[in-house]
Amino acid sequence: MSDDKSKALAAALAQIEKSFGKGAIMKMDGSQQEENLEVISTGSLGLDLALGVGGLPRGRIVEIFGPESSGKTTLCLEAVAQCQKNGGVCAFVDAEHAFDPVYARKLGVKVEELYLSQPDTGEQALEICDTLVRSGGIDMVVVDSVAALVPKAEIEGDMGDSHVGLQARLMSQALRKLTGHIKKTNTLVVFINQIRMKIGVMFGSPETTTGGNALKFYSSVRLDIRRTGSIKKGEEVLGNETRVKVIKNKVAPPFRQAEFDILYGEGISWEGELIDIGVKNDIINKSGAWYSYNGAKIGQGKDNVRVWLKENPEIADEIDAKIRALNGIEMHITEGTQDETDGERPEE
């Protein structure tokens, strides 16, 4: 670069720093080492691997959408439990007014430490979310759900009144404000969304999500969660077989998917995933109905092995670590804003 260009650039940089503060513009040279991406585990080993970075990225917006009763809220509560386990502070903006503390506690959520808001309007919900993010004291915020973020004008109006595009404009404005603060405070914000059907679509999928297109653009990760079957023991239904597809991913290659079981009253079957993925990666050996680890038999049949892993959490954690290392996933989970940390997985 010529001397004249260098002087002009130096003057411009000095003016920018004078106007907007030091660090407003930086050169990505050797002194500015790229930091490891911090993540919060989803509570599902398979999904952590599918995301490519070991969990949901902090400082980003994540959208989780799917049909009714597909496990959207369960997945979010599992992630909240994982965040709290590492000392993180979490908030749950319950726009649907359907939060169940008993169920959340069963999933490992420390309900007494969870900040819960049940706002009256969409504007109030998003303003609360923005204030929490800007505080810098929250590690994870869940908004459940976008479809329930009803604009104030619609609530105060009469039934049948037309309010075309109000919710989409509300989301667009809120996300413009939120994005910068989310990055600066390194907060993970998860929006749960519902599916609607587009009328008159002849080709392609007729499904769409609520709240307009803004959330699709601002989200770094979009997860499509579906129930694919039921888990039965005789005639009794014990849970759901679930598939999650990574529709969009700005931090790793997209279009991967994970399959896991969600058991009623327990949540995601982490031990079941350890068995399936462990066998696939040759960490757990399967011979007929028998499973063995490090040359020792650990049970006959998947259900018995799952119980054994629950009773031996240190072995389960060891298998988990081996699977992550084999797949090149290092857990860059930092401690939250609280001082205490707990290295054990919450009991189910």
UniProtKB/Swiss-Prot annotation:
Cysteine pairs bridged by disulfides in the record: none
GO molecular function, a single term: ATP binding
Entry-linked CDD domains: RecA (cd00983)
Protein name: Protein RecA
Keywords: ATP-binding, Cytoplasm, DNA damage, DNA recombination, DNA repair, DNA-binding, Nucleotide-binding, SOS response
Biological role: Can catalyze the hydrolysis of ATP in the presence of single-stranded DNA, the ATP-dependent uptake of single-stranded DNA by duplex DNA, and the ATP-dependent hybridization of homologous single-stranded DNAs. It interacts with LexA causing its activation and leading to its autocatalytic cleavage.
GO terms, biological process: DNA recombination; DNA repair; SOS response
Key word DNA-binding present: yes
Lineage: Bacteria, Pseudomonadati, Pseudomonadota, Betaproteobacteria, Neisseriales
Organism of this sequence: Neisseria meningitidis serogroup C / serotype 2a (strain ATCC 700532 / DSM 15464 / FAM18)
Assigned GO CC terms: cytosol
Binding residue positions for ATP: 66-73
Position of the signal peptide: none
SUPFAM superfamilies attached to this UniProt entry: P-loop containing nucleoside triphosphate hydrolases (SSF52540), RecA protein, C-terminal domain (SSF54752)
Subcellular location, record wording: Cytoplasm
PROSITE patterns: RECA_1, RECA_2, RECA_3
Assigned protein family: Belongs to the RecA family.
